[in-house]
Curated annotation (Swiss-Prot):
GO terms for molecular function: DNA-binding transcription factor binding; RNA polymerase II complex recruiting activity; RNA polymerase II core promoter sequence-specific DNA binding; transcription coregulator activity. Component of the Mediator complex. Residues 32-43, 58-68 have a biased composition (Polar residues). The gene is SRB4. It is found in: Nucleus. Residues 48-57 have a biased composition (Low complexity). Keywords: Activator, Coiled coil, Nucleus, Transcription, Transcription regulation. One of its GO terms (cellular component) is mediator complex. This is Mediator of RNA polymerase II transcription subunit 17. Pfam families: Med17. The keyword Coiled coil applies. Residues 245-271 form a coiled coil.
Length: 639
């Protein structure tokens, strides 16, 4: 047929374009523009449009057998099994499972498709309307295979990369890597072949075996392209520039070396002065080690002034001080460190306390006490400031930590001595009370009042107070030495050691005072019950018998410690006194006053007749019982 009014008329034998009824199959409207062949392959709608244009412009072939009147999708989808059709529908609707398809959604899609269907027609210019490129890409149905129908189709995810695209990208990356490797290998081979003509050993060593077999060595050469010669002016200018750069570099190096030399010289002077001060003030007997200052965060030298290495068990103070170099004053500072995390450094007010012994004597008429003795400061240098002398500061710190440990051990021992007249007034004072006397051990600050008390006139018991204080300090040293000896000996017991057993500070002093009072009372009882009644009777105090030392050690250090500790055996031994009362021809009464814990009194009485035969041998703990027993002996056996 011929064109009519600018429009192309189609032959009936070749078929006419029709619009498929969407009720034939429940697919999206965009799928209507695409045709699916019987073998499952897809044909783009754009290609059909192109073929229709070619039909309108070219003569139409009269062959009705080669062209089908209607390409019906129902022939493919209608006869498709459900196990293939359902996954296809789910994929086209972006659904993950068949249960997500509801009747309301299907009705809504049908209504939207009925409103949005566009029939393909001819425009006034004879062209056929075509869809967008993006729409055409969506109209291509996928090829249906058995593997795809059996597998569960997952919903499309725009952010995820398909496996095929990922494999394609992987292949491209590998191709680029192989290409770069080949190019670098080719460059290396080229350089090796070029180098083999100049330096054969180096070139042949870097050539690959394939290149050695394929190309002879030294077969590639290169020529040097000479630069145009410079004239005299350019040569002179270049020489001047080179010399200028060299001179400038030399001047910069000179200035840099001079600056660094000045810094090193200054640092060397500071270090020399620092170590000179340390060697001047620190002796070989001081324990010096490295530690980090928690206040400055720098590593510094520290001095250990505590007595832990000497056997001390005092844990309240580490006994460590940091040597800090004050750059402003150019001097060393000794700063003690506390165990507490809150307080890093100990102030002078908290450490400068020393022990003082006060002796008060009771006034019988007024029932009051008067100060009759006070210990003095044995080292007068403690009262003088020593901010610049590190050795004196170390000596002061050693003295004060020893005094604090002494008070700590006194308070620890006084807990078990409260039944015998020992009590606390505050954390810095321990009081020992005895008949007619009161002894106070107090930690007092080192201030002007301590200095003024040293100039007061001497009292009656000042010497006795000093002796008691010296005795306490010596006994603390004995405790340290016993701890050292225990550390040198092998452990023979699995039981945990208790230091309370060797804590003998107040007990020897209190034991001597109480034993003296007990002895006076016993003498008074014997005088009243025996001497005043029996004529010609007398009493005498027998000399004490010395006990031989039974400690022998083969090891030299242990033997030396035993010898040093043995010097205090007489003080540490429990007090014991023997009294002999002579009754003339009636016999002898021997009384032995001893103690089991330094503080109590045990009285042993032995009465022997004139023939030396022991008549009574008994022990008393009460003076009233002793008095009654002496009355019994005198009345029954003497008179």
């Amino acid at each position: 047929m011929e064109p009519d009014d600018g429009h192309n008329s189609l032959n009936q034998d070749n078929g006419i374009p029709i619009v498929l009824d969407p009720n034939l199959i429940n697919l999206r409207s965009r799928a209507a523009s695409a045709t699916v062949t019987t073998n499952g392959t897809t044909a783009d709608s754009s290609e059909d449009s192109g073929s229709q244009q070619s039909v309108s412009s070219a003569p139409i072939q009269q062959n009705s057998e080669e062209h089908s009147l209607v390409s019906n999708p129902y022939e493919t989808y209608g006869r498709m099994p459900l196990q293939k059709l359902i996954p296809l529908i789910l994929q086209m609707r972006n659904a993950s499972s068949f249960s997500e398809l509801t009747e309301e959604d299907l009705l809504r899609d049908i209504e939207r498709e009925e409103k949005g269907i566009l029939t393909t027609g001819l425009d006034v210019e004879g062209d056929i309307e075509m869809g967008d490129a993006d729409e055409e890409s969506d109209l291509k149905p996928q090829e249906i295979t058995d593997d795809d129908s059996n597998a569960r189709l997952k919903p499309n995810n725009d952010s995820a990369i398909p496996q095929e695209e990922f494999n394609q990208m992987k292949r491209e990356v590998l191709e680029h890597i192989n290409l770069a490797l080949n190019e670098s290998s080719l460059s290396l081979e080229f350089i090796s072949l070029l180098l083999s003509s100049v330096r054969p050993s180096v070139g042949v060593g870097s050539m690959s075996p394939f290149l050695k077999r394929s190309v002879p060595t030294a077969s590639l050469n290169a020529d040097k392209v000479e630069l145009p010669p410079k004239n005299k002016t350019e040569t002179l200018t270049l020489a001047v520039i080179n010399r200028g750069w060299k001179l400038r570099s030399l001047e910069d190096s000179k200035a840099l070396l001079k600056e660094n030399y000045a810094k090193l010289q200054k640092s060397l002077e500071v270090e020399h002065a620092h170590w000179a001060m340390i060697s001047q003030h620190i002796s070989s007997t001081d324990v010096v080690f490295k530690m980090r200052d928690r206040q400055t965060g720098k590593r510094s030298l520290a001095v250990k002034y505590g007595y832990e290495d000497s056997g001390s068990l005092y844990k309240q103070d580490r006994g460590v001080a940091v040597l800090r170099h004050n750059m402003d004053l150019n001097k060393l500072e000794l700063v003690p460190i506390s165990n507490s995390k809150e307080e890093v450094h100990i102030t002078a007010n908290s450490v400068e306390r020393f022990m003082r012994v006060h002796i008060y004597t009771k006034i019988e008429e007024e029932d009051d006490y008067i100060l009759s003795g006070e210990s003095s400061i044995d080292d007068q240098s403690l009262l003088q400031p020593c901010h610049d002398d590190i050795s004196r500061q170390i000596a002061r710190l050693k003295f004060f930590i020893f005094e604090r440990e002494l008070m700590y051990q006194l308070k620890k021992e006084a807990v078990s001595l409260m039944p015998y007249g020992v009590n606390f007034e505050n954390e810095n004072k321990v009081v020992l009370e005895s008949p007619g006397e009161r002894i106070e051990f107090e930690m007092v600050p080192l201030d002007d009042s301590a200095l003024l008390s040293t100039h007061e006139p001497r009292r009656v018991n000042d010497k006795r107070a000093n002796i008691i204080l010296i005795l306490l300090r010596m006994l603390l040293v004995v405790i340290h030495k016993k701890q050292l000896r225990r550390g040198l000996k092998p452990a023979t017991s699995k039981h945990k050691y208790r230091a309370d057993g060797d804590l003998l500070l107040l007990r020897p002093v209190l034991g001597r005072i109480r034993h003296r009072n007990y002895l006076q009372v016993v003498k008074r009882v014997v005088t009243e019950c025996v001497l005043n009644i029996v004529p010609g009777s007398s009493i005498e105090l027998l000399p004490q018998r010395s006990e031989p030392d039974t400690l022998h050690a083969r090891e030299a250090n242990i033997a030396s410690l035993n010898k040093q500790i043995g010097l205090f055996d007489k003080i540490l031994r429990m007090p014991r006194s023997e009294l002999r009362t002579s009754l003339g021809a009636k016999g002898v009464i021997d009384l032995t006053l001893k103690s089991s814990n330094y503080c109590n009194a045990i009285i042993q009485v032995i009465y022997a007749d004139s023939a030396g035969k022991t008549v009574f041998d008994t022990v008393f703990t009460e003076l009233k019982e002793l008095e009654e027993f002496l009355h019994f002996i005198v009345s029954e056996y003497v008179l």
